[in-house]
Amino acid sequence: MDQYNALHSFAHADGNYHLMGCMLSAASCNKWWMDEILKTKEYAKEQEAIVKLGENQVFYLPYLMGERSPHNDPSARAAFIGMSMDTTREEMTQAVLEGVAFGLRDSLEVARNLGIQIERTKICGGGAKSLLWKKIIANVMNLKVDVIESEEGPGYGAAILAAVGCGEFENVESAVDKLVHVVETVEPDAELVEKYEERYQKFKKYYPALKGLF
């Protein structure tokens, strides 16, 4: 259990517990940036212009609605850091995608500090449609990222639990084996992992530095 409540703990099926890291703004950060700032629906086209990973000097804090994991701070706010006269549209778009990945990494670090061994992760939903974002997440986390067939994460998971509860499956594991299908796996690249590790260590310093100003 997490004594600081950086992760949320829930009773799960079969007497187990579910630990959840909750970001209040993840894919919605990209939607806000594209819709409200860039005024475009061409999400894929904007991302196609990003060609170099791991070297962006612009950082983005993904706290549009405050943040839960790991900060539990409703007053936290989003911010761009590191811009100059040379900063491009593509670099800021990339910073948004990377900022969300760094936020996910924050929860991963809490879990690891609790002694939880994590070797790979699964992804679904709107963000899973972006090859670039999946690649960034894999390298920021240094994990294999499995993309599952269903785009509906919470709803699909609830349906699986209901099927187990109704006796359609013997247990959760057998239901998942039957109903959750991996359609793609994105693997981290050692060179990019090293670059993103350096950038993540910088990212971690920005929230504590700005906390008193939010």
Task: Set out the residue ranges of the language-model regions.
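Active-site core segments that coordinate phosphate-bearing ligands/cofactors
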Residues: 1-214
